[in-house]
Amino acid sequence: LAKEEQVTCDFQVMDAEHLTFQDESFDVVISRNLTWTLPEAAQAYKEWSRVLKPGGLLLNFDANYGATNFAETSDLPENHAHNQLGNSLMQECEDIKRQLPISSYLRPAWDVEELGKNDMEQISIDLGLSKRVYKERDEFYNPTPMFAIAARKQSNS
C-alpha cells in the first residue's frame, strides 16, 4: 500500500507490549484487532502511552472477542473465511483465546479503566463501528461487534 500510494514508510515488527521506541516519539498510535490477542494487554496500553507525545492520540479498533466462541461457526455465512479453516483449528483458536486474561474482561469498559491508569484522557468509545464497516455478510463479516476507542495522552501543561 505504501508503494502504491508513493509514501515512504519504515515498517518494523516488534512486541506491542515492549516497544523499542523512545518515550514520546509519536503523535498517533493506531491498533486494529490486536489488543484482544495480547497476553498482557495492560502492558501494551502502558507502552502505547509511553511512546505517545503529550496530547498524542491513541486509536484502538478491537472487539470483545473473549465473549465469542470461535468454535461455533454455524451463524457465519457459508463462504466465510472461518468455515474454510476446519473445526479442529477453530477449536484450537478458541482454546488459546480462553487462556488470555483479556478474554475474561468486559470490554471496552476494561480498556477505558486501563487507559485512565496510563495518563490517557478524553476517552471516547464508538460502539457502532461494525454497523458501518460490515454492510453485508460476506466472507469477511465479523459477527462480534467491533468498537473504536479514541484517547489523548495528558498534556504536560
Where are these regions (language model features)?
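Class I SAM-dependent methyltransferase SAM/SAH-binding core
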Residues: L1-H18
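A short acidic, Gly/Pro-enriched loop at the edge of an enzyme's catalytic core
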Residues: M14-V29
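A short SAM/SAH-binding and catalytic strip from SAM-dependent methyltransferases
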Residues: V28-A42
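A short glycine-rich, Lys/Arg-flanked "PGG" loop and its adjoining helix->strand segment in the class I
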Residues: A42-L57
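Conserved class I S-adenosyl-L-methionine
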Residues: L57-L89
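Short glycine/proline- and acidic residue-enriched helix-loop micro-motifs
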Residues: M90-I102
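Short alpha-helix
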Residues: P101-D126
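Core SAM-dependent methyltransferase catalytic element
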Residues: N118-D119, G128, K135-S157
